[in-house]
Amino acid sequence: MLLAIDVGNTNTVLGVFEGRRLLDHWRVETSTRRTSDEYGILVRQLFTHRGIDPMKVTAVVVSSVVPPLQSNLEKMSERYFRVRPMFIGPGVKTGMPILYDNPREVGADRIVNAVSAYERHHAGVLVVDFGTATTFDAVSPKGEYLGGCICPGINISMEALFQNASKLPRVEFARPPHVIGRNTVHSMQAGLVYGYVGMVDGICARMQAELGFPVKVVATGGLASLVASESKAIHQVDEFLTLEGLRIIYGRNHAS
């Protein structure tokens, strides 16, 4: 079995594969204060809770945008699963040319998403990932990573409103009953939801015009479904895009 770990700034998503089949997945808080033993015990408890034997894990692959966690995840993998993890980064075969001024600058999660989306569609794609940052990544019909946009994430924007406007409360990112809010909470929700929908549709339209070829727009991330339900640009939501990309890239580096 393959344990795939996607470490984001806010959350860490784990998935366990048996061959091409995703057996289960979990989302936990990303914490640089958690030790390697704490991570190991947590992951083994998640496995046990779902009736999965952790001793059947034969490989671990990690995509991380939090460098301080690399050492702990490496120790966790070696101690609790007895395997050396593969980290997505320079030197790893992705099968995708990266046409970026400095390819080393591109976040591992963005490349993993691009590989996963292209593998599924084999056409021009735009990937919109609603994480701590909201990212847009373009892939050519030839499977080349072209670049993209990085915007403040939804939760960052909500927290900024709360922190910097003393009379505004924290609100849930949820669809309000009307675009024209009739109270403060609904007004903030309208601005956040429809503001992000407008941003997504606007950036996708501009990127498609610049690319000059048709693209499939694929969204992923915890808040993707809500935005996609109001968006005119998003064609598909793929909750497991990053985990599948990790599986694909691991396979390309360990072909039997």
From Swiss-Prot:
Homodimer. Substrate binds at residues 100, 107-110, 184. Coiled coil: none annotated. Its cofactor is NH4(+); K(+). CDD domains: ASKHA_NBD_PanK-III. Disulfide bonds: none annotated. It holds the Pfam family Pan_kinase. NCBIfam families: baf, PRK13318.1-6, PRK13321.1. Its main location: cytoplasm. Its EC number is 2.7.1.33. Pathway: Cofactor biosynthesis; coenzyme A biosynthesis; CoA from (R)-pantothenate: step 1/5. ATP binds at residues 6-13, 132. Belongs to the type III pantothenate kinase family. GO terms for cellular component: cytoplasm. The lineage of its organism: Bacteria, Pseudomonadati, Myxococcota, Myxococcia, Myxococcales. PANTHER family: TYPE III PANTOTHENATE KINASE. Keywords: ATP-binding, Coenzyme A biosynthesis, Cytoplasm, Kinase, Metal-binding, Nucleotide-binding, Potassium, Transferase. This is Type III pantothenate kinase. It catalyses: (R)-pantothenate + ATP = (R)-4'-phosphopantothenate + ADP + H(+). InterPro entries: ATPase_NBD (IPR043129), Type_III_PanK (IPR004619). It comes from Myxococcus xanthus (strain DK1622). K(+) binds at residue 129.
